[in-house]
């Protein structure tokens, strides 16, 4: 059975978010096309996603010195445990659907923190004499991103940092098969906002058939 993680990073629901509306349309269509698959929702705004901080570095230092989990402080244990949970959940899935808004040319900070929980040497990638090699090959991902302007092409494509960073990190850990759906231009062309949303939903439903 294929396991799909529906990873969202938006404090708004589908009623208040173009991206979430498209994401939920995709998941609904996916479930209809693949009723045997398991879909798990991870709302990053309601999930413990530790940032890499002094506690985390201290914990890693203790592990490197040969000390065990019991040597960590309570704060270190809580953060490391949460990071491990996020990592293990991600590693044991087969498909990933990220739904994010663009905030100031990137995605919400919690997405970066989440990716930092995933890019762990010896778990999702390894170092070799020829450079790092991703360990999550054979998996695939979809990124649905909503932007007020148009960033998929033209002069502003170069500053779509969230899309580029997510694709780069996923590729680094071995997830090289990625799809992208842009829900864009709603603020630049408010009179076409509903049309843009409906077109993106149609695109998402079609993609769900072969994802």
Curated annotation (Swiss-Prot):
Its EC number is 1.6.5.-, 1.7.1.17. Keywords: Flavoprotein, FMN, NAD, Oxidoreductase. It comes from the Bacteria. The keyword Glycoprotein does not apply. Gene3D superfamilies: 3.40.50.360. Signal peptide: none annotated. It catalyses: 2 a quinone + NADH + H(+) = 2 a 1,4-benzosemiquinone + NAD(+); N,N-dimethyl-1,4-phenylenediamine + anthranilate + 2 NAD(+) = 2-(4-dimethylaminophenyl)diazenylbenzoate + 2 NADH + 2 H(+). One of its GO terms (molecular function) is oxidoreductase activity, acting on NAD(P)H as acceptor. Its cofactor is FMN. SUPFAM superfamilies: Flavoproteins. The keyword Signal does not apply. Pfam families: Flavodoxin_2 (PF02525). Binds 1 FMN per subunit. FMN binds at residues 102-105. PANTHER family: FMN-DEPENDENT NADH-AZOREDUCTASE 1, FMN-DEPENDENT NADH:QUINONE OXIDOREDUCTASE. Quinone reductase that provides resistance to thiol-specific stress caused by electrophilic quinones. Homodimer. Belongs to the azoreductase type 1 family. This is FMN-dependent NADH:quinone oxidoreductase 3. It comes from Bacillus cereus (strain ATCC 10987 / NRS 248). The lineage of its organism: Bacteria, Bacillati, Bacillota, Bacilli, Bacillales. The gene is azoR3.
């Amino acid at each position: 059975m294929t396991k799909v993680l529906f990873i969202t990073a938006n404090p708004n629901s589908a009623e208040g978010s173009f991206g979430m509306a498209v994401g939920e349309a995709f998941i609904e269509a996916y479930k209809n096309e693949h009723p045997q698959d398991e879909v798990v929702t991870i709302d990053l705004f309601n999930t413990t996603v530790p940032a890499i901080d002094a506690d985390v570095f201290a914990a890693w230092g203790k592990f490197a010195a040969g000390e065990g989990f019991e040597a960590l402080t309570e704060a270190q244990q809580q953060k490391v445990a949460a990071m491990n949970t996020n990592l293990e959940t991600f590693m044991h899935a087969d498909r990933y659907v990220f739904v994010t808004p663009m905030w100031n040319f990137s995605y919400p900070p919690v997405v970066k923190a989440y990716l930092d929980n995933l890019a762990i040497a010896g778990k999702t990638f390894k170092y070799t004499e020829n450079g790092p090699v991703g360990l999550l090959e054979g998996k695939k991902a979809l990124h649905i991103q909503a932007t007020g302007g148009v960033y998929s092409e033209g002069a502003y494509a170069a500053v779509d940092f969230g899309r580029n960073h997510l694709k780069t990190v996923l590729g680094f850990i071995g997830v090289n098969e990625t799809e992208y759906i842009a829900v864009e231009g709603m603020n630049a062309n408010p009179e076409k906002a509903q049309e843009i949303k409906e077109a993106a939903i149609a695109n998402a439903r079609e993609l769900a058939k072969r994802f």
